[in-house]
């Protein structure tokens, strides 16, 4: 592969990553807007932090077991966020919240954790640090002779 071809592939990869980032941001903006009238900041952040932290924990396990980063890493937190907020989607369709909805990543219980969203932010940042550490460790092990 020539240097020019390698550079073209790298540029295409960067644009693809930008596309995934833009899609994830637009999707999350749509989810945030879906909470209008229901204390959007509190509810969106709660389920985002819980879903994304769960996804990052799963991604960390995959990195450790497969010894490489996960494919499409932005899809995992978005999918987990959607899963965590499923009871709210059901609520907008007319279904009242029930205790069994805690099956969706603790949908009801997560609102009653001491510290509320500050606690979930700390959990999210810890999960993010664990994932990035696992990815970095795998890359450094792969680059050793």
Please tell me what each predicted stretch does:
Residues 1-145:
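N-terminal membrane-targeting hydrophobic helices
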């Amino acid at each position: 592969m020539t240097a020019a071809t390698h550079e073209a592939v790298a540029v295409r990869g960067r644009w693809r990553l930008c596309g995934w980032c833009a899609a994830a941001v637009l999707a999350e903006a749509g989810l945030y807007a879906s909470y209008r009238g229901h204390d959007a900041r509190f509810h969106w952040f709660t389920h985002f932090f819980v879903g994304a932290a769960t996804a990052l924990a799963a991604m960390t396990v995959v990195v450790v077991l497969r010894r490489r980063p996960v494919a499409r890493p932005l899809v995992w937190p978005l999918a987990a966020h959607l899963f965590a907020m499923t009871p709210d989607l059901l609520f907008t369709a007319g279904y009242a919240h029930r205790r069994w909805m805690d099956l969706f990543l603790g949908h009801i219980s997560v609102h009653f954790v001491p510290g509320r969203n500050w606690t979930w932010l700390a959990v999210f940042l810890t999960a993010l640090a664990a994932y990035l550490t696992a990815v970095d460790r795998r890359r450094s092990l792969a680059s050793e002779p």
